């Protein structure tokens, strides 16, 4: 993730996980781990704690509830954190265009970190690079149609990180949808394109 984000920009790289909470490769756990790498603690003035959650200036975030100016699933960045005359912490966010908003602590209940998100939350969105963890803990959710949704969020590059047997299981697993039967061919074509560009067959990065 760090390498791709440095090359393409954080806004163009997205980790997509089948689960939000289950396992070390779930989106919530990945968000905390990735954030410590790309946006570590600098000062107390540049972060705010809401319950057991922490937000920092420069964090990548997602809106999780529709409002007048932003929709559920919209992505943005925290651009500043201030304190008003009553001592309340206020968080400035930029969702692109003229959507520069200030959030109270109560409104942050509808905001999540978004370095990683669930595949479901990413439906309808596209990113230059998509990184997908393929691990045993996600087996129960890894059907062909879900993997297809994740792979097709990528405009330029897909990185699969994990275990090949789990990937093959997901590609061939019985599916309730008929429209995703070309997933195996799509992954093969990604591999062929990668091979042509790098002159070497790609290997799945082995999970540590």
Residue ranges and their predicted role:
Residues 1-72:
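Conserved helicase/translocase motor-coupling segment
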């Amino acid at each position: 993730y760090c390498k791709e984000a440095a090359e393409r920009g954080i806004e163009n790289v997205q980790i997509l996980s089948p689960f939000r909470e289950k396992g070390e490769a779930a989106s919530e756990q990945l968000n905390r781990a990735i954030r410590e790498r790309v946006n570590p603690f600098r000062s107390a003035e540049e972060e705010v704690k809401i319950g057991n959650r922490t937000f920092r200036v420069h964090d990548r975030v997602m809106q999780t509830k529709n409002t007048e100016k932003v929709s559920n699933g919209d992505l943005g960045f925290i651009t500043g954190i201030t304190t008003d005359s009553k001592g309340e912490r206020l968080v400035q966010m930029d969702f692109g265009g003229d959507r520069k908003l200030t959030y109270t602590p109560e409104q942050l209940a509808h905001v999540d970190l978004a370095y990683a998100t669930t595949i479901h939350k990413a439906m309808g969105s596209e990113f230059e690079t998509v990184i997908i963890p393929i691990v045993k803990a996600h087996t129960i959710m890894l059907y062909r149609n879900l993997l297809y949704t994740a792979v097709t969020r990528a405009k330029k590059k897909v990185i699969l990180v994990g275990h090949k047997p789990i990937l093959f299981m997901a590609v061939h697993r019985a599916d309730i949808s008929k429209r995703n039967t070309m997933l195996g061919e799509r992954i093969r074509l990604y591999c062929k394109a990668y091979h042509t560009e790098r002159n070497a067959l790609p290997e799945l990065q082995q999970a540590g």
